[in-house]
Every structure is written in structure tokens, then in C-alpha cells.
Amino acid sequence: MLKLLLGDPNARKLKRYQPILTDINLFEDEIASLNDDELRGKTSDFRTRLDKSSDSSIQECLDDLLPEAFAVVREASKRVLGMRHFDVQLIGGMVLHEGQIAEMKTGEGKTLVATLPSFLNALTGRGVHIVTVNDYLARRDAEWMGQVHRFLGLSVGLIQQDMTPIERRKNYECDITYATNSELGFDYLRDNMANDINEIVQRDFQFCIIDEVDSILIDEARTPLIISGQIERPQEKYQKAAEVVSTLQRAAEMGKDGIDPEGDYEVDEKQRTCTLTDEGFAKSEELLKVKDLFDPKDPWAHYITNALKAKELFVKDVNYIVRNEDAVIVDEFTGRVMPGRRWSDGQHQAIEAKEELPIQPETQTLASITYQNFFLLYPRLAGMTGTAKTEEVEFEKTYKLETTVIPTNRPRSRADWVDQVFKTESAKWRAVANETVEIHKKGRPVLVGTTSVEKSEVLSALLGEQDVPHNLLNAKPENVEREAEIIAQAGRAGAVTIATNMAGRGTDIILGGNSDYMARLKVREVLFPKLVKPEDSHKPPVPLQRRKDSSVGFGKEENNSKDKKVNHSNDVRAQENLYPCVLTDSTEQVLLDLEHQLIKEWGDRVLSPIELEDRISTAAEKAPTQDPLVQSLREAISLVKSEYDVVVKQEEVHVREAGGLHVIGTERHESRRVDNQLRGRAGRQGDLGSTRFFLSLGDNLLRIFGGDRVAALMNAFRVDEDMPIESGMLTRSLESAQKKVETYYFDIRKQVFEYDEVMNNQRRAVYSERHRVLEGDELKKQVIGYGERTMQEIVYAYVNPELPSEEWDLKQLVGKVKEFVYLLDDLKPKDIEALNIDELQAFLQEQLRNAYDLKESQIEESRPGLMREAERFFILQQIDTLWREHLQSMDALRESVGLRGYGQKDPLIEYKNEGYDMFLEMMTNMRRNVIYSMFMFQPAPPSDKE
């Protein structure tokens, strides 16, 4: 109704950009007439104009430059990438520049849009960060889109997991830096644990553009980034707890009205908790031969609870995979493995005990921050995604980010077919396999989205039984390494790709296949064995060639004989069909000559895989180069691509005529947004395409959140299990379940944010104090300030101004002063008995300053400059030690404060108040410990060698 009365607010917003869009288009001919050097010269021209503006007017100046700057980027992109920004992409760029979220559908070129505001804001010289969800995408975008920025004279940096601090600092100093959210966050935490200013790698934050913003700011918001150190806990307790739990029986249903159900423990999948019943407690205590699981001297409750969760809530090949005797977490949103990440509070150790793996030591938090509070550190924040509108309220409330929906460049031609719901899971998977086979036979590519590694392997086995060649993209390491290759061919005629949770998200599926990427892979395959060091040559899978007489499309080769027994789906993986055709003899000869030329110039097998990858990527760019080797490499890639293009273009026509990409969803996700992301893979840029979801009444979403209505439906449908069910009531149950889950998780994220906000204020205070110390030229002044404050606190602790001075306990006061400052050993109570409280405070502070000067002269005799080093060392040591303990105390407070709700108290307010008192106490202890340490410090005598 409001839309009818007031008009669509999104349409009104878009209308506001039209005059600026007209201005950009008016610049197009003028900018196009410039030669390359003149176009590059525009960057320094813009910077000169910016330098003339004051800090307060810099934003206005950027806004004034926007039309011409965007026109320059559009022209550079045309020349370097062969891609011209559409008008809707220019609008997307304006939305990002204003610090909003731009919702752009899959395939509308979000990556290209980011080049516009990143160029404009990088002109300030203060740095722009472009954030992606994984290393592969960060690297791809830095190589691909970075060409435009490099062409225009800007420096482009890239942060990758295995970089050294020196490499990181160099890349953060660039005008535009591509990085993943986790690398940025961990670098921030590490910088705030540095003991030397030269160890800091990041500079002050300015402007940040987040790609797939919903994934990072919504999906990842519940998980804090944590840097931890090891602590010792008895490993045998984890093993014993796993043994005990394996004998306990799960209750068939949850207890009601405080009455325990039959069984040893109950599981609440919605809240993700496991609770022992009275019977379970008794049985556990008997098996462990202890009187009380909660005995503080020999606690067991924590170990048993974690073992129960490991048994019931953490599923192998869904939540984690086992690799090289290690339990590796699988990201529930992307389906990727997260090596190096571990669950905290002993949960990971419980999983290792369950899987009978070596148990790693437990960890203690040294530093942590949530993504919510990390990204709020940026003065200006913007983001892009294909699906933001469903979370619009959360973006607005938590991050103060508006969402603007950018129209598509071409109208959508995708058909979303009606859901098919089956009674059982096995019937659903059979139906998925049958539809996949049917669509595959028509020559259309199929993308099947699954929710776990385990489910993807089930479908892979079913397709293997029907001899359907397919590619599997999930968290298993052998598949992750082929991610780009799998996505490159996912749009080919008849291709079947099974992907876990959007694992290839961020990479477009191009109908007919991606000839550009196939050509790069081919050149890489030829050069890899000859140029990469033998110890690094864990060679990528080498695909077999398609024979010249094979038909167009993604069919099976004749040599895959049908009578071969299929033991596992790997037998029919479609890897051999990566390259669309055999190269001509002349092109093969060009590759051979190139190989000899590069061995001669670069050396025989001396490069690392990353170095070779870098050189191939540089050659695949269109940016100008003076290097003859890069030029030869570029010509070879172009030659291979032109041959592949012939077949790929043919396939593209076949695929379009057959109906485009078909996407199958095998389970409704907890969030409608994730379902929309999967659907959005089909029908990019107005292409034809279709989607369908297959569901079963046993799917997690319906089982956990659908409640009794779904249970009633299961009994009501007396149909054959292979017969799909269609029911309005079921559809409504699904939608209602999804909304319930979205609200439930929004509340959790909101709570995480509110509690972390308390920690965030404390974190900022501690980190700014640390930074002051690292940069500190005035450390002496700071330490004396700590001492003066300590003297003031001692005076007020031992002197009551309301009592006459004769009753003051000056003996104890003097004793306490000497505890901190032993150099005041000759101070006597009679020296201060005539002073009032203010005079007493001033006198003690004066004595402290004199004693500190004396201490400094003693220390400096040992080595000039040593006093400043000692000050820095002791302040940082105390901050880090006490902050670490404070984090643990705050965690414990947060665990216990929830119970206060039963006493009609607001847990959050209690947490804020007590947390604040604990923080003040920590800062007081830090000041006192530093003063004590400085006066007690005795440098070691110089050694004889010196």
C-alpha cells in the first residue's frame, strides 16, 4: 500500500543517479580520443586536484571528480580487458562510492563494478581494501581487475595466506589491496600483538568494498576471529569421555515440564545442545568411578558435554573431514575446508577423541574480534552481493548500511520450476539423479547444489551407477585444487557439476565453457613439469585430450567401456574432457618452442608453482608489457584460446538452443538468501536457464524447525515414496520454517553483536594504549603518569579525608609506597604527618618522579637507551598478559550472566556493568605492575665477550 502511495523507494534512489550517469556518458567520446599515456596522465591530474582540497572537503572533491573518473576507468577497462561498463554497472559504482550495499544479480559483473569506486577512492593515497571470501577469488580479482588499475598507474596489492610480514606490509602500502576477510582480520589482531612498530603490517583503514557482503557480514558474523595460544589439559580425559559417551543412549524425544525423558541424554538440534538426564549423570559417574562430575578438583562435566556434542551434533563429512590424521573444519556456508581453524573450549579435542585421532593441545584466546566490529573500524564501508534485500533490516541496524537493488542489464529469462517434495531422503536422491540424467541427455549443463561433502558423494555414486560423467566440487582437497578448472567447464554442453554449498561462488558459469581459462590451464600443464622445482611438482591433474572424432559436448569417451565395474564415482569423473579439442600440430610446436625458450631464460625446474602461476596470469592480461618472454607466453595463450574458441562457440549455440544451464537444489537452506544464490547461477545476463529444488520431509530444515505440522503431514501422505508431493500447506510450512530460522539466527547475531560491543569498547582502549606505546616517544611521561596515578590510589586507600589526620594509618601507607618504589626506603611516617590529603598526594608524586629520575640514571649507565626499551617491554608485557586473562574472565562472566535472567535481571546490563568494573581493575593492575617492574628492573651485567 505504501509503495502505491509513495512510489518504490528503490526506484526513487535510482532516479537520483540518472543526471550523474548522463555526465559520465558525456565524457565518453572525449576520454576515448586520448592515447594511452594521456589516459594514464588523468590519474596524476585527479590527484593534483585532490591535493588542493582540505581534509574536510575531500569527500566533496571526490564526488565532483566522480563522472570524469568513472569515464576514465570505463575507457581503461575497454582497452585492457575488452569490457565496457554498462550503465547499470556505473550506477552500482556510484552506490558503492556512497557507502551502500549494491544488490546485483549473478553474472551482472559485480567484480568489474568494484574497479570504479576503488579507483576514485584510491586517488586519496590512503588505500582501498577490496575483500573477497577466499584466497582464490582475491588472487583472481587482483590479477584480472588489477590490470585496469595498473594501466592507470595505481599500485595493486594482494594478501595471501602464506605471505611473510614484509610481503604483507608492502602489499598493504599499495593504493588498492585485494584480501580475504579472515586475512584482514587476523592481520589486525596480529598487529595489535606486535612488540615492535616495524612488525605492524596494516596502515590506518579508509575505504573497504566487500564482495559477497552477505556471506561475510551475515553468515560469518556469529563466528569470532580468534588468535590463540596452547594450554595443557589432560588428553586422556577426552579419550575417556568419548568411551563413556559411546555407551550412553540418546532419548527418543525431549523432556517436558521438567521431567526427564527415558534415556541417558537429550539433544536439542535447534539450540545445538546436549544435556545429560539424571540417569545419564548416574551412569557417567559410575563408569568414570567419580562421585560428582562437577567436582572442581577433578571436573568431568565439560568433557562429557563436549563428547556428547561431538557424537550427536558434529558429523563427519558434513561439519568436518578427516585428513592426514587431522579433523579439518568445513565451512557450513561455502563448503570449503578451513585448515588451521579449530573449534574452541575443547570441542575440537572431543572430535579428535571420537575419530581416534592424535589429540592436539587445547588453546587459550590471546586476541579476538567479530567480523561485525572489525568492519565497523572502517570510516567508510560498502558491499556487493546478488542477494541482500532479504537481510536489508540487519544491514541497516547493525552496520548502518543502506541496500540499493541495481536493475539487470537484460531482462531475466530463467524459469524457476515448482519444488518436488518426497517422503524419504532416498527417494529424493533418486529423483535428483533421474532429472540430472534427463537434462544431461538433452545436452544442457547441470549444476547440482548439495549441503555437505557426504551428500555430494551420495549423488556422485548414484550418477556413477548410471555412467554419467560429472565433476565433484566439495571440501575434499583433491577437488578443491581443481575448483577453477571445474567451474571453467561447468557450462559446457552436457556438463554435470556437483557443488557443495556454492563452493565455486564468485566465478561465473559461462555457457559453452570458458575458453580463456582452458587455454591458461593448457599452457600451465605443458610448462609445469619443465619449469617447477621437482620438490614442488605435486602436479595438477593432467586431463586427457578429447579425440578429434568425438562429438561436440560433454559426453563420455568411447574408451570408458560400459562393462567396467564402477566402484566409486571417481571412475566417471569428467576430468578427461577439460579441453574441447586436440590442438593442431603447428600450435603444439609453438608450445614446444615456448617451453625451450623459457627453460633457457628462466632455468630448468627452478620456479615455485606460485611463481609460474603469476607469470602465466601476467601473460594472460592485456596490460602493455616490454618483456619479450611475457609477450611470447601471451601469444601462445592467445593461439590456444583461438583454437578452443571454435569448439566452445559451437557448444554455446548448442547449449542455448537446448535451454541453458539447469540448477538443481537438493535441500532448502536455512536462509532464503542462500537458495536465491544457488538459483542465481542460472540465467546470467539474460541467458536462458531453469532451476528446481528437490526436498524430502526428513530434511534438516523441516525436521528441526517445521515442528509438529510436518510430522502430521508425513503421516497424512499415504503415497508411494517415489511420488513427489505438492501441497500448498507444505510450501507454507517451508516458508514459515525459513522465516523462523532467519529470525532465530538474526537474534543470535544481534546478541553476539551486543555482547561484543562491550568487549569492543574495551578492545579499542587497550589497542590504542598499545599503539601509543609502540609509537611512543614519550614513554617516560607515560610511565610516570602510571606512577602518579598509583600514588593517588594508595593515598585514597589508606587515608579517610573525613577523619582527623591523627587517625590516618600513615605507617601502612608508607609501607605500601615502599613496596612499589624501593628507592624511597628512607621515607618515614613523620615526614608526612603534617600534610593534608592534597599535599600528601603531591608530595608522594614528587618523590616518585625524583626516584624515577634516579632509577633512569642507574639504568642508562649500563647502556644508553635501555630505559626506554625496558619501559616499552614492561608496558606491552603487562597489557598482553592482563588482557589475555581479562578475555577469559569476560568469557566466564558471559557464560554465567545468562542465569541472572531468572532473578529478573537483564543479563546484558549485568554483563556491561560487571565487565566495566573488571576492565577498570585490569587497567589499574597494569599501571601498578608496570611501576613495580620498572623499579625492580636490574639489567644483567655486561658479559666478558662484550
Curated annotation (Swiss-Prot):
Its EC number is 7.4.2.8. Residues 534-569 are annotated as: Disordered. It is a peripheral membrane protein. It is an enzyme of class 7 (translocase). One of its GO terms (biological process) is protein import. GO terms for cellular component: cell envelope Sec protein transport complex; cytosol; plasma membrane-derived thylakoid membrane. GO terms for molecular function: ATP binding; protein-exporting ATPase activity. The keyword Signal does not apply. ATP binds at Q89, G107, E108, G109, K110, T111, D508. The keyword Membrane applies. Keywords: ATP-binding, Cell inner membrane, Cell membrane, Cytoplasm, Membrane, Nucleotide-binding, Protein transport, Thylakoid, Translocase, Translocation, Transport. Residues 546-569 have a biased composition (Basic and acidic residues). It is found in: Cell inner membrane; Cellular thylakoid membrane; Cytoplasm. It catalyses: ATP + H2O + cellular proteinSide 1 = ADP + phosphate + cellular proteinSide 2. InterPro entries: Helicase_ATP-bd, P-loop_NTPase, SecA, SecA_CS, SecA_DEAD, SecA_motor_DEAD, SecA_preprotein_X-link_dom, SecA_SF2_C. Monomer and homodimer. Part of the essential Sec protein translocation apparatus which comprises SecA, SecYEG and auxiliary proteins SecDF. Other proteins may also be involved. Part of the Sec protein translocase complex. Interacts with the SecYEG preprotein conducting channel. Has a central role in coupling the hydrolysis of ATP to the transfer of proteins into and across the cell membrane, serving as an ATP-driven molecular motor driving the stepwise translocation of polypeptide chains across the membrane. Probably participates in protein translocation into and across both the cytoplasmic and thylakoid membranes in cyanobacterial cells. Belongs to the SecA family. PANTHER family: CHLOROPLAST PROTEIN-TRANSPORTING ATPASE (PTHR30612:SF0), SECA INNER MEMBRANE COMPONENT OF SEC PROTEIN SECRETION SYSTEM (PTHR30612). This is Protein translocase subunit SecA. It comes from Prochlorococcus marinus (strain SARG / CCMP1375 / SS120). The lineage of its organism: Bacteria, Bacillati, Cyanobacteriota, Cyanophyceae, Synechococcales. The gene is secA.
